[in-house]
Amino acid sequence: MSVSRPARGADPGLSARPMSTFPLGPRRVRRSGYGAMQLAGPWAVNAPPDRVSAVGVLRAAVAAGIDHIDTAQYYGPDVVNDLIREALYPYPRELAIVSKVGVFRDVGQDARQLRQGIEDNLRSLQVDQLAAVNLRLPSPGRVDARFDDQLAAMVRARDEGLIAGVGLSNVSLEQLRHAADGTEIACVQNLFHLADRDSAPVLQECLRRGIAFVPFCPLGLPRGLANPVLTSPVVVRTAIRLGVTPPQVALQWLLQLAPNVLLIPGTGSTDHLLENLAAEHVTLDDQALRELAGVGA
């Protein structure tokens, strides 16, 4: 599937317009990016079954115009960053690589460990600065001294030039407001998709403040695992009616939801990568939006 050709059900006029972008820290990126987690398997704990194919997916992403790749040193662990470096180094100037620190297998980290995590990412990716790094929390919660210490460590890393932007991940509305009142936040990465909209208040606060909102698991769960998004009768029926695929419906719903949404769907398949990118050209009509509003309700 050609990324430049609209999928069936798309607005043909969209393909002739510039791709939609939104600020990610000090730069602007295309709203459709790529999440590299699945290159280390469904739960990011293995080497890729086909390293050559994994490298090919990354190169295809950049060739297709993706300029925002999400990763983490603990994917594998020590696998995905190495793949990115092998596939793409020296990196295109416009490529924004975003990583995350703060949680390793659900264990929260202190300021010293956060700094070490940032340095590990820089080393493995062979860069002097990352476009942004997300402070990943075990779960959304209350503001406390530990959160302030972690946030201060991230700000120091930005002030020292190790990262261009401070991001947050898995945060509550209270934590977002507290952080954004004290420093510039580049992006927020929370669980959000058609069937799980608990972070809607966080998304709206990000929109109000001009912060990029990056839903993780935008398609529900990795392909091959049962999930309430891609198997939803409403999503499937909408895809059939519009002549597109269920993932394209789910991704375009997110894009139409708010202009600050940046997508990072993951896949280990070049075909699926291009299918996901083609979601940019899909138009969800009023009927589709009405019916999709009830998914997960």
Regions inferred by a protein language model and the residue ranges of each:
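Acidic (Asp/Glu)-rich catalytic clusters
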Residues: 26-28, 63, 85-96, 122-128, ...
